[in-house]
Design a protein with these regions (language model features):
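Conserved beta-strand signature within the Rossmann-like core of class I S-adenosyl-L-methionine
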Residues: 196-203
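A short glycine-rich, Lys/Arg-flanked "PGG" loop and its adjoining helix->strand segment in the class I
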Residues: 182-195
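Core SAM-dependent methyltransferase catalytic element
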Residues: 218, 222, 229-254
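N-terminal auxiliary segments of SAM/dcSAM-dependent transferases
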Residues: 1-56, 64-67
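Conserved SAM-binding loop of SAM-dependent methyltransferases across substrates and taxa
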Residues: 100-112
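Conserved class I S-adenosyl-L-methionine
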Residues: 89-99, 117
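A short acidic, Gly/Pro-enriched loop at the edge of an enzyme's catalytic core
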Residues: 88-91, 152-167
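Helix-to-beta-strand junctions that scaffold the AdoMet/dcAdoMet cofactor pocket
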Residues: 111, 176-177, 193-195
Length: 254
């Protein structure tokens, strides 16, 4: 895994209840269940004790998986996804819903002669999102000279047709509330990609529909796969899946 020095926060919204308070709550519930299992065991209630211990361990394990995914796992996974794109280094890349820049800046490191542009509405799906936070991370990662951020809606992108060589998105499109809005976000990604351009979307749900639609549009090399335990947000029931595809046509680079 390539190192990163920026502050990328914790995936999720913590405006009502802080991440610290939620962590304390989870720890409290887990400890209470484990303590109760001990008392049940001492009183001969073996089945109840086992169920309580399993519940306490499950709560703790789920929290640990979530923390790992948001602080470590997604960086490992996206390093591999970006490596698989085999970027030349001179592409123009767009990140839909870039947040604090975890994927945007990892991509920018691979674009010494290119440009990485991130768009976001800077809402609550990742606490502390702001253009200034992303640009501060770009400076910390030494890629500020090739990074740009815009406040923009991914369903109505402020870019001309065929503006980008690569479009990526991580855990963002699912935040659009309506199916029609999510379809429109994919339509915009399709529109702004150049012929021969590559698309990589990682998300918690809706990815199979994206893949089916891209196949119907005649896109090449459409792949849909589970990204594995490193991006389990609490467990396999909240797993992340990836869609990759290539737009029909030949890029200007050949």
């Amino acid at each position: 895994m390539r190192g990163h020095t920026g502050d990328y926060g914790i995936d999720g919204s913590f405006h009502i209840v802080s991440a610290r308070a939620q962590l304390v709550g989870v720890a409290g519930v887990s400890a209470a269940l484990l303590l109760w299992s001990v008392t049940r065991w001492a009183r001969g209630r073996r089945l109840t004790a086992a169920l309580a211990a399993a519940g306490g361990g499950g709560v703790a394990g789920s929290a640990a998986l979530y923390g790992y995914a948001t602080r470590v796992g997604k960086f490992v996974v996206w390093d591999r996804v970006l490596d698989d794109l085999r970027l030349r280094g001179d592409e123009t890349l767009l990140d839909l819903g870039c947040g604090r820049g975890a994927v945007l800046l990892a991509a920018a490191k691979r674009l010494p002669r290119g440009r990485a542009i991130g768009v976001d509405l800077w809402r609550a799906d990742q606490t502390g999102n702001s253009p200034s936070a992303t640009l501060a991370n770009a400076a910390l990662e030494n890629v500020a000279d090739r990074v740009e951020v815009r406040t923009a809606d991914m369903t109505a992108l402020p870019f001309a047709d065929a503006s980008f060589d690569v479009v990526v998105s991580s855990l963002a499109i699912h935040n659009i509330r309506t199916p029609g809005g999510r379809r429109q976000a994919l339509s915009e990604a399709v529109r702004v990609l150049r012929p021969g351009g590559r698309l990589a979307i990682a998300d918690l749900w809706g990815t199979r529909e994206h893949a089916d639609r891209l196949r119907a549009l005649g896109w090449r090399n459409v792949r849909h796969r589970n990204l594995g335990w490193r991006m389990w947000y609490g467990g396999p029931w909240v797993s992340t899946r990836l869609v990759t595809a290539t737009k029909p046509g030949v890029s200007a680079a050949g």
